Structures are given as C-alpha cells and as structure tokens.
C-alpha cells in the first residue's frame, strides 16, 4: 500500500501479487531498510508492546490487542485511519474430518459456546470483531456497543477485557463504526499463489 501510495508500483491485486510485483516490493523495502527507515522487526506480541510503550518507535504494524495493552499503560496509542485503506485479516474455526461420536459432539458444543457471545464480547474489548456480530454485541454494555461497534463517543470509561482503563468518556474509536471500518479494507491477508516465492524474498529482506 505504501509503494502504491508513493506511485512506485501499481498492483493488479495486492492480495495476490505476481512474482514481478513481489520482486519490486521487496527491492523497495530493502532500499528503505538500508536507508535506516526501520527501527526494529518485532517477533512477539510483548516485543511490539514494549517498542511502542517505551517510545522506541512511534509508528508500527501492531495487532489490535497489542494496541489495547499499550493503552492500558495510559499511552494514547491508536490505529491511524489511512486514506489508502486498511489491511484486513480474519480467522475461523473448522472441525477435523476424522471427528466422530462424543468428540464430534464436544467439538460442536465448543463451536456453539464460541459463537454464543462471551468470546465476541471479550475480543471486542481488544479491538477485534466476531463473525457473529449480534451475540457479541449482546455481551457488551450499551456504552461498549456504542464505542466499539457504532462509532459513538464513550459515555463512560472503556476498559480492556481484564478491567484496565483504555479510553475515557467522550473518546471515539479510531476509524469509526463497524461498517465504516470494514468499508475501508483495501486488501485482505491471504495465502497468495506465489506464497513460496514471497517467503523466499521476505527472507532476503530480513537478511539485507
């Protein structure tokens, strides 16, 4: 997205790049790295939190729960909405084909519980969305629903899943409502057709 915004590369499909597009992208990143653009490359959740909380970096790619963890320390860390849009990703649960009998029944019970609302409410307070929106919203307070899903200012403090304050009354969530945020997804993370080539080139970038 940076390369395209700068006019360096025009992609046919950023979510499924060609080998030529991958080559051009990695070449761009290697030059940026050699020019001192990047402070660090985090390898764990805690490392990403510490880099931001310490002030060692001021902008980075982060998971939403990591942003929440930084905010619990009283630091105003936010996802900055970009005019180019967001990079989106999602995950889901699936059952193994060999399950049968009590194991299959137990797996379905777990899926039912997972989608019943508690998990959706928990991850909402980390900044994530559940695929089952209605049950997730039902597990939140009116204030939390307004803040996380509806783009409304908080009417009271917003807290993390473990109770630490992350936002004050009057704050609005970065990016707006559920609908507004999803409407701005410009590319979805997925397994590209040229994934093996991409992995090899990414290793070149790491080693540069």
Task: Name these PLM-found stretches.
Residues 1-9, 90-96:
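Periplasmic solute-binding protein
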Residues 95-173:
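Mature extracytoplasmic/periplasmic domains
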Residues 37-100:
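Extracytoplasmic/periplasmic substrate-binding proteins
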Residues 6-46:
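Glycine-centered hinge/linker elements that transmit conformational signals in sensory
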Residues 2-6, 32-37, 56, 64, ...:
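Sec/Tat-exported extracytoplasmic proteins
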Residues 19-23, 43-46, 54, 101-105, ...:
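Soluble non-cytosolic domains of exported or imported proteins
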Residues 1-3, 26-30, 49, 53, ...:
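Non-transmembrane alpha-helical segments in soluble domains
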Residues 162-208:
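Conserved C-terminal helix/tail region of periplasmic/extracytoplasmic solute-binding proteins
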């Amino acid at each position: 997205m940076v390369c395209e915004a700068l006019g360096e590369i025009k992609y046919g499909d950023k979510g499924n790049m060609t080998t030529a597009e991958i080559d051009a992208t990695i070449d761009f990143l290697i030059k940026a790295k050699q020019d001192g653009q990047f402070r660090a490359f985090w390898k764990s959740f805690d490392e990403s939190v510490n880099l931001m909380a310490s002030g060692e970096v001021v902008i980075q790619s982060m998971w939403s729960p990591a942003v929440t963890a930084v905010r619990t320390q009283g630091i105003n860390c936010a996802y900055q909405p970009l005019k180019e849009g967001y990079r989106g990703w999602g995950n889901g649960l699936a059952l193994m084909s060999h399950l049968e009998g009590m194991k299959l029944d137990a797996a379905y019970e777990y899926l039912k519980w997972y989608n019943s609302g508690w998990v959706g409410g928990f991850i909402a307070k980390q900044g994530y969305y559940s695929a089952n929106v209605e049950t997730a919203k039902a597990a939140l307070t009116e204030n939390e629903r307004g803040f996380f899903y509806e783009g409304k200012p908080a009417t009271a403090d917003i807290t993390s899943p473990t109770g630490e304050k992350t936002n004050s009354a009057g704050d609005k969530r970065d990016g707006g409502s559920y609908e507004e945020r999803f409407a701005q997804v410009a590319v979805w993370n997925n397994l590209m057709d040229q994934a093996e080539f991409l992995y090899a080139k990414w290793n070149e970038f790491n080693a540069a």
